[in-house]
From Swiss-Prot:
Cellular component terms (Gene Ontology): nucleus; transcription regulator complex
Taxonomic superkingdom: Eukaryota
Keyword DNA-binding tagged: yes
Entry's localization field: Nucleus
Protein's UniProt name: Pituitary homeobox homolog Ptx1
Organism: Drosophila melanogaster (Fruit fly)
Keywords of this entry: Activator, Developmental protein, DNA-binding, Homeobox, Nucleus, Transcription, Transcription regulation
Motif (Nuclear localization signal): 464-470
Composition skew (Low complexity), residue ranges: 70-98
Biased composition (Basic and acidic residues): 243-258
Family of this protein: Belongs to the paired homeobox family. Bicoid subfamily.
Length: 509
């Protein structure tokens, strides 16, 4: 006896009728399902009760797939699996066709016809009877092992195990629940693919598809809503900020334009000579004229009051600068006088350097004649050291009158202090002082100031000295630019040899 299961969707009531009928005939009506030909309905109802009692999940595929057939046919025992196409509709009366007679010897053949359920996003309507028998949680967690309860035979899917609906061991569903709670769905298709790969079976029921799709849609809507809210807030903030910024920029540009207009360089005012003369005259009298005075000056000079005010301001600045420079110059001059001028204006610290200089003590200085080389072997002082010893104590000057005259001539040509000292020494020499012009015989031997000038030691006469002087002058060693000696200006006929020697020394030097 062949048995097949048929599922019919009732259009009017929207319920789902389940029954086991024979292969002879099947009649589906709005009220449910009627069987003919001695079909058995109690098996299906008992299977539903047992399934609800065990609280196991019901898979929609088991309702559609065929059970085991144990009947004696003409050809022997055969198992015919008939499938019905599930029609889900809301308005039209649903009908289900039973395909019988399809026998197969392969045993348990599982034909799937519910793949269209995965593409649909609408939920399946369930009759109140099934919904009362089964909890909602069990409907969302269905397994293919329910066929054993319906038919009483062996399980068509031995690789599936009956798992309680909510067990923490089912990791893929736990991950799905976590993803659903967090709403982390970047792509619904990729998430569905990951879940399908993680599950043991690639066939998901309609309830799972609808729930995941609804959750993903809900999360997507939530994200879209948040995104739209953020965009609107950002847009409004940008608009508000830009609205605030625009008047700021316009208000900032306006003062800039005003400043540019104010800072435009005006043309310099060129004053005439008459205007400058009038302004200078007024400035000499009053450096700070008031408003009325400036207006009068402006009328006289044919200028504006502003130009007159600016001119006085600049003129006062120029006047202050000049006054400041003058004060600085005066202070600098005072500092110079106090710091350096007093040193130059003070008398010499040691007047005895020049006033009390011993001009009569010339014997301490070496003679320049002894150090100068001459091309001829002349030793004018060698004759003085010769062996002529005259004991005539003769002074350098013949008479006192001539000595006084010479001293007066020297004093007239020299400065006051030096002339006075020279005249004093000459007077002393006229009285009986030794001759100050005596040159030592040896340049490294000095005569003492107390030693008298002995003319007896000289071996040559005045004529011999004059002859040597002429020879020296004719040789070209005399300097034409040398100043004449004051002694030579005086009466040279009455000069002694000592004085003549001094004249020669002056010419050579």
């Amino acid at each position: 006896m062949d048995r097949s299961s048929a599922v019919g969707g009732c259009g009017g009531g929207g319920g789902l009728g389940v029954g086991v009928v024979t292969s002879s005939a099947t009649a589906l009506g709005p009220g449910g399902l009627t069987n003919g030909g001695g079909g058995v309905v109690s098996g299906a109802l008992n299977g539903l009760e047992a399934m609800s009692a065990e609280s196991t999940g019901l898979c929609l595929q088991d309702l559609v797939s065929a059970g085991t057939a144990n009947g004696a046919g003409s050809a022997g025992s055969a198992e015919s699996a008939t499938t019905t196409s599930t029609a889900l509709s809301s308005g039209s009366t649903g009908s289900s066709t039973v395909n019988g007679g399809g026998s197969s010897t392969s045993g348990t053949e599982h034909l799937h016809s519910h793949h269209s359920l995965h593409d649909s996003s609408s939920s399946v309507s369930i009759s109140p009877a099934i919904s009362s028998l089964m909890p909602i949680s069990s409907l969302s967690h269905l397994h293919h092992s329910a066929g054993q309860d319906l038919v009483g035979g062996y399980s068509q899917h031995p690789h599936h195990t009956v798992v309680p609906p909510h067990t923490p061991k089912h990791e893929p569903l736990e991950k799905l629940r976590i993803w659903a709670e967090t709403g982390d769905f970047r792509d619904s298709h990729s998430s569905m693919t990951a879940v399908a790969n993680s599950l043991d079976s690639t066939h998901l029921n309609n309830f799972q598809t609808s729930s995941t799709s609804s959750i993903s849609n809900r999360s997507r809507d939530r994200k879209d809503g948040n995104r739209s809210v953020n965009e609107t807030t950002i847009k409004t903030e940008n608009i508000s900020s830009s609205g605030h910024d625009e008047p700021m920029t316009t208000s900032g540009e306006e003062p800039k334009n005003d400043k540019k207009n104010k800072r435009q360089r005006r043309q310099r005012t060129h004053f005439t000579s008459q205007q400058l003369q009038e302004l200078e005259h007024t400035f000499s009298r009053n450096r700070y004229p008031d408003m009325s005075t400036r207006e009068e000056i402006a009328m006289w000079t044919n200028l504006t009051e502003a130009r007159v005010r600016v001119w006085f301001k600049n003129r006062r600045a120029k006047w202050r600068k000049r006054e400041r420079n003058a004060m600085n110059a005066a202070v600098a001059a005072a500092d110079f006088k106090s710091g350096f001028g007093t040193q130059f204006m003070q008398p010499f610290a040691d007047d005895s350097l020049y006033s009390s200089y011993p001009y009569n003590n010339w014997t301490k200085v070496p003679s320049p004649l002894g150090t100068k080389p001459f091309p001829w072997p002349v030793n004018p002082l060698g004759s003085m050291v010769a062996g002529n010893h005259h004991q005539n104590s003769v002074n350098c000057f013949n008479t006192g009158a001539s000595g006084v005259a010479v001293s007066m001539n020297n004093a007239s040509m020299l400065p006051g202090s030096m002339g006075s000292s020279l005249s004093n020494t000459s007077n002393v020499g006229a009285v009986g002082a030794p001759c100050p012009y005596t040159t030592p015989a040896n340049p490294y031997m000095y005569r003492s100031a107390a030693e008298p000038c002995m003319s007896s030691s000289m071996s040559s006469s005045i004529a011999t000295l004059r002859l040597k002087a002429k020879q020296h002058a004719s040789a070209g060693f005399g300097s034409p630019y040398s100043a004449p000696s004051p002694v030579s200006r005086s009466n040279s006929a009455g000069l002694s040899a000592c004085q003549y020697t001094g004249v020669g020394v002056t010419d050579v030097v």
